[in-house]
From Swiss-Prot:
Biased composition (Polar residues): 1-16, 105-134
Annotated organism of origin: Danio rerio
InterPro entries on file: HD, Homeobox_CS, Homeodomain-like_sf, Lambda_DNA-bd_dom_sf, POU, POU_dom, POU_domain_TF, TF_POU_3
Organism superkingdom: Eukaryota
Protein name in the entry: POU domain, class 3, transcription factor 1
Length: 368
């Protein structure tokens, strides 16, 4: 009773019209929609039967129902189908493929007529083609029969391709100035032959100027703030550093050589250079006459005392340190000249053997 009471007015008077379900209009329109769809499908099959040849040669246009029927004039049905198609198109784009109905798409050339993939289109309700009525075009995305698998629409594919291409161009463009910079640095970098020649010349000029490798390292620290060890300078002269480090150290050493050569003339500059590092004493050259006097004294006394060295230095007008070093070097030379294991004769024995004639031993005959 509660159910039937909803359809009975309160004044208990029956309406003149028969009772109808509230959704009867939509049910009627839905029925009409199904009937029209069946009719369209039937006409499509008749078109296939009348046209001979492959279905690819069909030139029918899309079915655009424009008659003022319940199906075409129903705005709420068109709106529902529009929403349904929009949701479906969004789902198709998200899933990466398109569900399709094979609907013939008219083309400009008859020989290219095919079941081409087309996106869903909706005509505006007030467009001239629809005569003020909303018309639905059931031409959703489909696949071609004789073409390869369709990819994304060019509107979706080309931006990705263009972005990838532009990204590749952006990745390639920074490399061009970098490569030019590398070429420029390679042109400025000296070759291995140049480094070898410079290292040889540097060593010769350093020895000629009287500087040790440690002196050069300390001088570089005083001039440029970078102190280099004696090992680094030695490895540079021996070409044992890496090519990169050789290229970095070459201009510093070259500049040091130029400043040293320019400051060699005046004594004040020599003192300044000596203050930069421990300056090696120059090699003392002894005259021939002085050297002969030292040799005679060495033959008499190979190891003189400190007093004898001082007296000899005053006599020969030499420094005491020079005389002492000369005797040390002379003794080392004598040791190298004497074989190992043979007793070293004294100088007196040598002179006595040279002055006295050799001894002759007489043979005595046996007593008979």
């Amino acid at each position: 009773m509660a159910t039937t009471a909803q359809y009975i007015p309160r004044n208990n008077s029956l309406p003149s019209n028969p009772l109808m379900h509230p959704d009867s209009d939509r049910m009627h329109q839905g029925t009409t929609y199904r009937e029209v769809q069946k009719m369209m499908h039937h006409e499509y099959l008749q078109g296939l039967a009348t046209n001979t040849g492959h279905p690819m040669s069909l030139t029918h246009h899309q079915w655009l129902p424009t008659s003022n029927t319940d199906w075409t004039s129903g705005t709420h049905i068109g709106q529902a189908e529009h929403n349904k198609a929009s949701v479906q198109s969004r789902e198709d784009l998200g899933n990466g493929y398109h569900r399709s109905h094979l609907v013939h798409q008219p083309t400009q050339n008859s020989h290219h007529g095919s079941w081409a993939p087309t996106t869903t289109h909706h005509l505006s309700p007030l467009s001239p083609a629809s005569n003020g009525h909303q018309s639905l075009v059931y031409s959703q995305t489909g696949y071609t029969m004789l073409s390869p698998q369709p990819s994304l629409h060019h509107g979706l594919r080309d931006p990705l391709h263009d972005d990838a291409g532009s990204h590749d161009n952006q990745m390639e463009s920074p490399q061009q100035p970098f490569s030019h910079h590398q070429d420029h640095s390679d042109e400025d970098a000296p070759s291995s032959d140049d480094l070898e020649q410079f290292a040889k010349q540097f060593k010769q000029r350093r020895i000629k100027l009287g500087f040790t490798q440690a002196d050069v390292g300390l001088a570089l620290g005083t001039l440029y703030g970078n102190v280099f060890s004696q090992t680094t300078i030695c490895r540079f002269e021996a070409l044992q550093l890496s090519f990169k480090n050789m290229c970095k150290l070459k201009p510093l050493l070259n500049k040091w050589l130029e400043e040293t050569d320019s400051n060699t003339g005046s004594p004040t500059n020599l003192d300044k250079i000596a203050a930069q590092g421990r300056k090696r004493k120059k090699r003392t050259s002894i005259e021939v006459g002085v050297k002969g006097a030292l040799e005679n004294h060495f033959l008499k006394c190979p190891k003189p005392s400190a007093h004898e060295i001082t007296t000899l230095a005053g006599t020969l007008q030499l420094e005491k340190e020079v005389v002492r070093v000369w005797f040390c070097n002379r003794r080392q030379k004598e040791k190298r000249m004497t074989p190992v294991g043979v007793p070293h004769p004294t100088m007196e024995d040598v002179y006595s053997q040279a002055e006295t004639p050799p001894l002759h031993h007489t043979l005595q005959s046996p007593v008979q």
